[in-house]
């Protein structure tokens, strides 16, 4: 399977962080808007915004995001950033993407949570008008933040669903702030009416996945701690949970110490619902075409598998049922030309 074919395949992505996926030209434009001086060469800039191929840990990997934070403190910046990430996705035939971000990371200079969400939604709408893509937004609560901060954010965004906000996630330092410390916040999100996905098992603890299952979470990000957990995988599959897999990112953060310790094959063999995602296009120096290529190389993934993974993504997405039907039809049409 050539890179050209992989790029042309229609794709759906569920797990993509806004602040970790800005293109270098976008970062330069955002810095100019914020009067922040950047290194003059892209080679130097990449050292600040792309994590090393091997970091010490997830926490080490997350430090890269601090460089971007000052660039995303105005509505104009957030609107342009959202447009930029959706544009990048559209250029590799991503027909549906959910882009997630944490409002509190853009509230340093006076924006409210609803200000940040509305700005991101405007940027996604701009991209949808210009490119052949459906782009939706998820809000992330930060695990390490106070529960009061997160509850205030939930309160501010509760009425934004009609404008294109479709769901909620908790991201950040999973090791220090495990799933069972978020129970009251997860219940608060559920009461708000937003569907949820959850980072789970990225830091190597299978209990966090089990706890998420106990809370009724039906989509989970990373789930690398499933490796070698036969009973948990069985339960994961039986409960029809969808895995948002992020191979390059997990190898970088040592969530998976090697290809062999990545849970894809075990989950695939068990009949699990898999989706392929970038996590952070820039921080991990990747895109979906590169991720698909890695799956072909390491796991022998075939075109018919990619069709199923993308169908999984659309069906598990938080968009409307009518939108899902349209997207599933587009997927089938695209893949039919390769599966004849």
Swiss-Prot record:
Gene Ontology molecular function, alphabetical: 2'-deoxyadenosine deaminase activity; adenosine deaminase activity; zinc ion binding
Any single Gene Ontology cellular-component annotation: cytosol
Catalytic activity: adenosine + H2O + H(+) = inosine + NH4(+); 2'-deoxyadenosine + H2O + H(+) = 2'-deoxyinosine + NH4(+)
Residues reported to bind substrate: 17, 19, 172
Cofactor section: Zn(2+)
Active-site residues, Swiss-Prot/TrEMBL: 202 (proton donor)
UniProt-listed InterPro entries: A_deaminase, A_deaminase_dom, Ado/ade_deaminase, Metal_Hydrolase
CDD domains per UniProt: ADA
UniProt xrefs under Gene3D superfamilies: Metal-dependent hydrolases
Residues marked Important for catalytic activity (site): 222
Keyword Metal-binding: yes
Keywords: Hydrolase, Metal-binding, Nucleotide metabolism, Zinc
EC code: 3.5.4.4
Annotated positions binding Zn(2+): 15, 17, 199, 279
Top-level taxonomic group: Bacteria
GO biological process: adenosine catabolic process; hypoxanthine salvage; inosine biosynthetic process; nucleotide metabolic process; purine ribonucleoside monophosphate biosynthetic process
Alphabetical list of SUPFAM superfamilies matching this protein: Metallo-dependent hydrolases (SSF51556)
NCBIfam families assigned to the protein according to its UniProt record, in alphabetical order: aden_deam
Family stated for the protein in its record: Belongs to the metallo-dependent hydrolases superfamily. Adenosine and AMP deaminases family. Adenosine deaminase subfamily.
Role played: Catalyzes the hydrolytic deamination of adenosine and 2-deoxyadenosine.
Name of the protein this chain belongs to: Adenosine deaminase
Organism: Streptococcus agalactiae serotype Ia (strain ATCC 27591 / A909 / CDC SS700)
């Amino acid at each position: 399977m050539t890179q050209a074919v992989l790029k042309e395949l229609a794709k759906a992505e569920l797990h993509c962080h806004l602040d970790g996926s800005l293109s270098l030209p976008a970062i330069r434009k955002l810095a100019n808007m914020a009067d922040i001086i950047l290194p003059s060469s892209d080679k130097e800039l990449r050292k600040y915004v792309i994590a090393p191929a091997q970091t010490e840990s997830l926490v080490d990997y997350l430090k890269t995001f601090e460089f971007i934070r000052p660039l995303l403190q105005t509505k104009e910046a957030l609107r342009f950033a959202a447009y930029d990430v959706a544009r990048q996705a559209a250029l590799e035939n991503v027909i549906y993407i959910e882009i997630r971000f944490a409002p509190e990371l853009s509230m340093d200079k006076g924006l409210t949570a609803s200000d940040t969400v509305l700005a991101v939604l405007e940027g996604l709408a701009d991209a949808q008008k210009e490119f052949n893509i459906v782009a939706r937004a998820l809000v992330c609560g930060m695990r390490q933040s106070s529960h009061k901060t997160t509850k205030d954010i939930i309160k501010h965004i509760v009425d934004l669903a009609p404008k294109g906000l479709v769901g909620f996630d908790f991201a950040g330092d999973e090791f220090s702030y495990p799933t069972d410390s978020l129970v009251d916040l997860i219940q608060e999100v559920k009461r708000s009416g937003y569907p949820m996905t959850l980072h789970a098992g990225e830091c190597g603890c299978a209990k966090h996945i089990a706890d998420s299952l106990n809370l009724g979470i039906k989509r989970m990000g990373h789930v690398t701690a499933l490796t070698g957990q036969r009973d948990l995988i069985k339960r994961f599959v039986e409960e029809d949970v969808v895995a948002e897999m992020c191979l390059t990112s997990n190898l970088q953060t040592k969530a998976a110490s090697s290809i062999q310790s990545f849970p894809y094959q075990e989950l695939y063999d068990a009949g699990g619902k898999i989706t392929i995602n970038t996590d952070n296009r820039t921080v991990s120096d990747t895109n979906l075409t590169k991720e698909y290529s890695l799956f072909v190389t390491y796991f022998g993934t075939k075109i018919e598998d990619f069709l199923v993974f993308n169908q999984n993504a659309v069906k598990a997405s938080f968009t409307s049922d009518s939108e899902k039907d349209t997207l599933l039809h587009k997927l089938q049409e695209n893949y039919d030309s390769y599966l004849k």
